[in-house]
Structure formats: structure tokens, C-alpha cells
Amino acid sequence: MSEFWLCFNCCIAEQPQPKRRRRIDRSMIGEPTNFVHTAHVGSGDLFSGMNSVSSIQNQMQSKGGYEGNISSNVQMQLVDTKAG
């Protein structure tokens, strides 16, 4: 028994090729503009308690650049997800 292949190009729509994302290298990235370093904040700082968060907010506000912002009170519930 033999195989017989027949192509119907008129019935098959060509699938568009997915667009390839342009690869970015370091030479394409410029220096930051209007960058002001105000504080270092790590995950440990946020989990050490609300007093620490308030302290960080006060430190950042003392550096300036927050004059146009509206302040608000935020309440968060921390949930410990450590595996037991």
C-alpha cells in the first residue's frame, strides 16, 4: 500500500508569525533622569511592624518631593505564611 499526499494551498490560511520581542542590551538603557535616592527599604523592614513603616514614611517625606501628594491612612493586616 502506498501513501498519497495532496496539498491544498488554497484551503490553508498561513498563520502569522508571532512578533519577536526586540532584545535590549545595556547600551540601549540611558541614565535615570530626576532620580532622588531617599531610602533603602527591604522586605524585613516592612515585616518588622507598623512603627518601622511609619518611620520609613517619615524619613522619605523629610527628603522632599512629596508636597503635591495627598496623604492617607492605610490599614494592613499582616498574615504569617511560614510553613510549619
Curated annotation (Swiss-Prot):
A single Gene Ontology CC term: plasma membrane
Role of this protein: Probably involved in the organization of the actin cytoskeleton by acting downstream of CDC42, inducing actin filament assembly.
CRIB domain span: 29-42
Domain of life: Eukaryota
Protein name according to UniProt: CDC42 small effector protein 2-A
Keyword Magnesium: no
Family: Belongs to the CDC42SE/SPEC family.
Lipidation (S-palmitoyl cysteine): C10, C11
